[in-house]
Amino acid sequence: MDELVIAGRSFSSRLMVGTGKFASNSLMADALAASGSQIVTVALRRVDIDRPEDDLLAHIDRDKYLLLPNTSGARDAEEAVRLARLARAAGCEPWVKLEVTPDPYYLLPDPIETLKAAEILVKEGFVVLPYINADPVLAKHLQEAGTATVMPLGAPIGTNKGVRTRDNIAIIIEQAIVPVVVDAGLGAPSHVAEAMEMGADAVLVNTALAVTPDPAGMAHAFRLGVEAGRRAFLAGLPAQQQKAEASSPLTGFLRDEQ
């Protein structure tokens, strides 16, 4: 399968994985391995980046995975920027998944504060991957600001509802000049396959892997879903049509039709 390229860096996997909600860190580590992922997101508020022996970080091989700190929990641009700076000061690579979610109930991203934070972080040399509503206009503004990707939500975080924002994501993909990563709400392998079939460059999944009784098994299923969807997109899906069209001749063997 072709490689994903973000900010000049190549990845063989198009499945990114989050580390929250797992029943144990060993289950999380097994899921990461089964997923084939190379990019792993970690909420900065959940770990002590300064301490590699932190139990969560001890289960993530930093030579194998790109550790992508995220600013989950930030309510405005100021908090998000502060979290990103703390991660870089602690020795993390200057990559950040930018999340600004002032509403703790629906966890929908704040477009104004997200754009504001992105502009600051890009100027400071960060590789910024912003989590956003599926808003094509905002996506264009973020790309113009210099973000490395845009990450529109399929559905609200943790809802497992799938690609509910399909029409807007299709517009974002059509207009994108950076990779489009569908993030949030993807609860089944069929959901990630759908996103990849649409032409998304990658997907990010967490809850669907963490809450299942078999995280590693589900991670492997999602891996296959991503690969199937990407291969289908590259091969070229047939156009949909209203009228039926037979795949084999209907005449000439039972009767002749004029």
Swiss-Prot record:
HAMAP family, per the entry: ThiG
UniProt-annotated catalytic positions: 97 (schiff-base intermediate with dxp)
Major localization listed first in the record, in broad terms: cytoplasm
Protein's cellular compartments: Cytoplasm
A single GO BP: thiamine diphosphate biosynthetic process
Role according to the record: Catalyzes the rearrangement of 1-deoxy-D-xylulose 5-phosphate (DXP) to produce the thiazole phosphate moiety of thiamine. Sulfur is provided by the thiocarboxylate moiety of the carrier protein ThiS. In vitro, sulfur can be provided by H(2)S.
Catalytic reaction list: [ThiS sulfur-carrier protein]-C-terminal-Gly-aminoethanethioate + 2-iminoacetate + 1-deoxy-D-xylulose 5-phosphate = [ThiS sulfur-carrier protein]-C-terminal Gly-Gly + 2-[(2R,5Z)-2-carboxy-4-methylthiazol-5(2H)-ylidene]ethyl phosphate + 2 H2O + H(+)
InterPro entries referenced in this protein's UniProt entry, alphabetically: Aldolase_TIM (IPR013785), Thiazole_synthase_ThiG (IPR033983), ThiG (IPR008867)
Protein name: Thiazole synthase 2
Keywords on record: Cytoplasm, Schiff base, Thiamine biosynthesis, Transferase
Pathway(s) where this gene product acts: Cofactor biosynthesis; thiamine diphosphate biosynthesis
Summary of subunit composition and partner proteins: Homotetramer. Forms heterodimers with either ThiH or ThiS.
Family to which this protein belongs: Belongs to the ThiG family.
